[in-house]
């Protein structure tokens, strides 16, 4: 008989944000577990099909205002909240903002716990694994609901917005210290995140309770038809938002005079129009540079483009990242890469491209592009080979998912 596993998600199988991450993992989980998905999505639009054997529960977040206010008031009566408030006041900065965020976090956790209890969603009389895909308020619910239940293993993944203080509106992650001491395992998708968390919260626990299991991407089919022009083809893929610093790519290209380059950017976002205008201003009169805005494109289509067009270089100049999937996808296609030394990117660029400083200048970007451009054929092929090797070692989805499944098997049998 399979062990029950409850997977708590932000959206999946509703909305679009998690499909590409969770669908591949599910195909491994169902091999050994009886899976129930508890989605907390606000969307009613179901966008992913799952096996008939997987039960899907769509959490109804609706609650009366009075009940919400009572939950907020109960914050003052919880022992953990006194420690939380003390930590907030010691942290300085926008204390009232941090306190406000903490109270809302607590209220959401209480509301979710009440829903689980009322509807008897989780069978806590038998051994099971409760697996949260994000390290957020569900985890506070889990630590309260299953307090002192040794037959239930509590596991969460930790990504970026749910891990780093900078991902929080007021520069502090609510209840992390409290939840840390009560989760059985925290699974990080990036080594940088694991080190960050351990230094900040983890000294009281064994390192084994902080596991690294990267997500990864699938290996594309080997379809390469050759380049479409004699120009060096460079690609980038990101949302058009300030922390992605697409303007640095533009500034770098503007300083190149002899290199014949075609740059394509995949992705849209709120700042795309202003970025386009900036590109027109700096690159519009440069006859050696072509650029094209592809807008939002499904990741499968992006990979097909990489394969068919024989992309020479992938570049990201982001100021902040987790473990960027866009970079993993480029590596899986054997593309040399340029990236900034933030978060997990230093673990992704080792002999397969150029690692820029955390805050590079346009000149730094130009020099890195020029270096890759000038590589001899043999050197470029060596970089391509190294990108594939690193992808296979660290970001191969099948290998990573299988390793994570083995971990869950072991955890589910622990006493």
Feature-to-residue mapping (PLM):
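Conserved donor-binding/catalytic core segment of Leloir-type glycosyltransferases
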Residues: 187, 217, 221, 225-244, ...
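N-terminal subdomain of nucleotide-sugar transferases
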Residues: 1-64
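Aromatic "clamp/platform" in nucleotide-sugar-dependent glycosyltransferases that forms part
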Residues: 319
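Conserved acidic donor-binding segment of nucleotide-sugar-dependent glycosyltransferases
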Residues: 351-362, 371-377
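A charged, aromatic-enriched C-terminal amphipathic alpha-helix characteristic of glycosyltransferases
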Residues: 301, 360, 364, 377-409
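Nucleotide-activated donor-binding/catalytic signature segment of Leloir-type glycosyltransferases, i.e.
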Residues: 276-305
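Donor nucleotide-sugar binding/catalytic pocket of nucleotide-sugar-dependent glycosyltransferases
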Residues: 55, 156, 177-222
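Short hydrophobic beta-strand element within catalytic cores of glycosyltransferases
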Residues: 313, 332-339
